[in-house]
Amino acid sequence: MSELKIEQIPTRTDNSVYLIKESGQGKVGVVDPSDAEPVIETLNRLGWELTHIINTHHHNDHTGGNIELKEKYGCIVVGPLADHDRIAGIDIDLKDGDTYKFGDALAHVYDTPGHTRGHIAYWFDESKALFCGDTLFALGCGRVFEGTFEQMWDSLGKLRA
Protein backbone atom coordinates (compact mmCIF):
# COMPACT_ATOMS: atom_id res chain seq x y z
CA MET A 1 0.00 0.00 0.00
CA SER A 2 0.93 3.64 -0.20
CA GLU A 3 0.74 6.72 1.99
CA LEU A 4 -0.60 10.06 0.79
CA LYS A 5 1.07 13.44 0.68
CA ILE A 6 -1.72 16.01 1.08
CA GLU A 7 -1.68 19.66 0.00
CA GLN A 8 -4.59 21.91 0.98
CA ILE A 9 -5.57 24.67 -1.47
CA PRO A 10 -7.90 27.38 -0.15
CA THR A 11 -10.40 28.44 -2.84
CA ARG A 12 -13.27 30.85 -3.12
CA THR A 13 -14.13 32.43 0.22
CA ASP A 14 -14.65 29.33 2.31
CA ASN A 15 -13.68 26.20 0.36
CA SER A 16 -10.70 23.90 0.44
CA VAL A 17 -9.50 21.67 -2.35
CA TYR A 18 -7.01 18.89 -1.65
CA LEU A 19 -4.21 17.64 -3.86
CA ILE A 20 -3.12 14.15 -2.93
CA LYS A 21 -0.09 12.22 -4.16
CA GLU A 22 0.37 8.57 -3.34
CA SER A 23 3.91 7.39 -2.72
CA GLY A 24 3.80 4.11 -4.66
CA GLN A 25 3.12 4.97 -8.30
CA GLY A 26 3.14 8.75 -7.89
CA LYS A 27 -0.50 9.18 -8.91
CA VAL A 28 -1.86 12.67 -8.20
CA GLY A 29 -5.49 13.43 -7.45
CA VAL A 30 -7.50 16.51 -6.66
CA VAL A 31 -10.44 16.18 -4.29
CA ASP A 32 -13.47 18.38 -5.07
CA PRO A 33 -11.92 20.97 -7.41
CA SER A 34 -14.15 24.04 -7.19
CA ASP A 35 -12.00 25.91 -9.71
CA ALA A 36 -9.23 24.80 -12.05
CA GLU A 37 -6.81 27.75 -11.81
CA PRO A 38 -5.65 27.39 -8.18
CA VAL A 39 -5.20 23.65 -8.77
CA ILE A 40 -3.12 24.24 -11.92
CA GLU A 41 -0.98 26.84 -10.12
CA THR A 42 -0.30 24.47 -7.23
CA LEU A 43 0.44 21.53 -9.53
CA ASN A 44 2.95 23.69 -11.43
CA ARG A 45 4.59 24.88 -8.21
CA LEU A 46 4.94 21.31 -6.93
CA GLY A 47 5.90 19.81 -10.29
CA TRP A 48 3.06 17.28 -10.09
CA GLU A 49 1.00 15.90 -13.00
CA LEU A 50 -2.71 15.40 -12.31
CA THR A 51 -4.06 11.88 -12.97
CA HIS A 52 -7.37 11.79 -11.02
CA ILE A 53 -10.27 14.02 -10.04
CA ILE A 54 -12.10 12.71 -6.97
CA ASN A 55 -15.56 14.12 -6.26
CA THR A 56 -17.65 13.70 -3.10
CA HIS A 57 -20.87 15.20 -4.51
CA HIS A 58 -22.29 17.17 -7.41
CA HIS A 59 -22.33 20.79 -6.15
CA ASN A 60 -20.45 23.25 -8.36
CA ASP A 61 -18.18 24.37 -5.52
CA HIS A 62 -16.84 20.80 -5.57
CA THR A 63 -16.94 20.03 -9.31
CA GLY A 64 -16.54 23.41 -11.05
CA GLY A 65 -12.98 22.65 -12.18
CA ASN A 66 -13.65 19.12 -13.45
CA ILE A 67 -13.93 19.75 -17.18
CA GLU A 68 -11.03 22.21 -17.51
CA LEU A 69 -8.74 19.93 -15.50
CA LYS A 70 -9.85 16.80 -17.35
CA GLU A 71 -9.26 18.49 -20.71
CA LYS A 72 -5.84 19.83 -19.68
CA TYR A 73 -4.48 16.67 -18.03
CA GLY A 74 -6.60 13.85 -19.51
CA CYS A 75 -7.29 12.58 -16.00
CA ILE A 76 -9.90 10.15 -14.71
CA VAL A 77 -12.94 11.55 -12.87
CA VAL A 78 -14.40 9.43 -10.06
CA GLY A 79 -17.48 10.19 -8.02
CA PRO A 80 -20.75 8.97 -6.58
CA LEU A 81 -22.88 6.65 -8.70
CA ALA A 82 -26.01 8.42 -7.44
CA ASP A 83 -24.72 11.72 -8.88
CA HIS A 84 -23.49 10.30 -12.20
CA ASP A 85 -25.80 12.47 -14.30
CA ARG A 86 -24.96 15.58 -12.27
CA ILE A 87 -21.15 15.46 -12.31
CA ALA A 88 -19.50 16.65 -15.50
CA GLY A 89 -16.97 14.27 -17.02
CA ILE A 90 -17.40 11.40 -14.56
CA ASP A 91 -15.70 8.17 -15.68
CA ILE A 92 -15.92 5.86 -12.66
CA ASP A 93 -18.97 5.56 -10.39
CA LEU A 94 -18.55 4.58 -6.74
CA LYS A 95 -21.01 3.63 -4.00
CA ASP A 96 -21.11 2.53 -0.39
CA GLY A 97 -18.86 -0.44 0.29
CA ASP A 98 -16.69 0.03 -2.79
CA THR A 99 -12.94 0.35 -2.61
CA TYR A 100 -11.06 2.53 -5.05
CA LYS A 101 -7.43 1.86 -5.89
CA PHE A 102 -5.70 5.21 -6.34
CA GLY A 103 -2.28 4.08 -7.51
CA ASP A 104 -1.09 1.91 -4.63
CA ALA A 105 -3.34 3.68 -2.09
CA LEU A 106 -6.71 2.18 -1.26
CA ALA A 107 -9.78 4.29 -0.49
CA HIS A 108 -12.85 2.86 1.21
CA VAL A 109 -16.05 4.50 -0.03
CA TYR A 110 -19.00 5.34 2.23
CA ASP A 111 -22.40 6.75 1.29
CA THR A 112 -22.91 9.86 3.43
CA PRO A 113 -26.25 11.38 2.35
CA GLY A 114 -27.69 14.40 4.07
CA HIS A 115 -26.04 17.40 2.43
CA THR A 116 -26.96 15.80 -0.90
CA ARG A 117 -28.63 12.47 -1.65
CA GLY A 118 -25.61 11.14 -3.54
CA HIS A 119 -22.83 12.33 -1.21
CA ILE A 120 -19.93 9.92 -0.57
CA ALA A 121 -16.76 9.99 1.53
CA TYR A 122 -13.33 8.44 0.92
CA TRP A 123 -11.29 6.91 3.75
CA PHE A 124 -7.61 6.17 3.10
CA ASP A 125 -6.87 3.93 6.09
CA GLU A 126 -3.09 3.74 5.68
CA SER A 127 -2.79 7.54 5.72
CA LYS A 128 -5.66 8.05 8.19
CA ALA A 129 -7.10 10.55 5.70
CA LEU A 130 -10.83 11.20 5.29
CA PHE A 131 -12.24 13.26 2.43
CA CYS A 132 -15.89 13.82 3.25
CA GLY A 133 -16.86 16.93 1.26
CA ASP A 134 -19.65 18.83 2.96
CA THR A 135 -20.73 16.11 5.37
CA LEU A 136 -18.42 17.31 8.13
CA PHE A 137 -16.69 20.63 8.87
CA ALA A 138 -14.34 21.68 11.67
CA LEU A 139 -17.24 23.34 13.49
CA GLY A 140 -20.22 21.24 12.44
CA CYS A 141 -21.78 19.61 9.43
CA GLY A 142 -22.90 20.82 6.01
CA ARG A 143 -26.36 22.16 5.35
CA VAL A 144 -29.05 19.65 4.46
CA PHE A 145 -30.12 20.45 0.89
CA GLU A 146 -31.48 17.25 -0.62
CA GLY A 147 -31.32 14.70 2.15
CA THR A 148 -32.91 14.61 5.58
CA PHE A 149 -31.60 15.44 9.02
CA GLU A 150 -31.89 11.76 9.90
CA GLN A 151 -29.67 10.87 6.94
CA MET A 152 -27.12 13.50 8.00
CA TRP A 153 -27.13 12.15 11.56
CA ASP A 154 -26.60 8.60 10.30
CA SER A 155 -23.81 9.79 7.98
CA LEU A 156 -22.01 11.56 10.82
CA GLY A 157 -22.30 8.39 12.89
CA LYS A 158 -20.82 6.37 10.04
CA LEU A 159 -17.83 8.73 9.81
CA ARG A 160 -17.35 8.60 13.57
CA ALA A 161 -17.08 4.81 13.48
Summary of predicted features, one role per range:
Residues 2-6:
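Extreme N-terminal starter segment of soluble prokaryotic enzymes
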Residues 12-13, 25-28, 35-111, 128:
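Active-site HxH/HxHxD metal-binding segment of metal-dependent hydrolases
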Residues 28-30, 140-141:
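A generic structural signal for short coil/turn motifs at secondary-structure boundaries
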Residues 106, 116-161:
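Metallo-beta-lactamase
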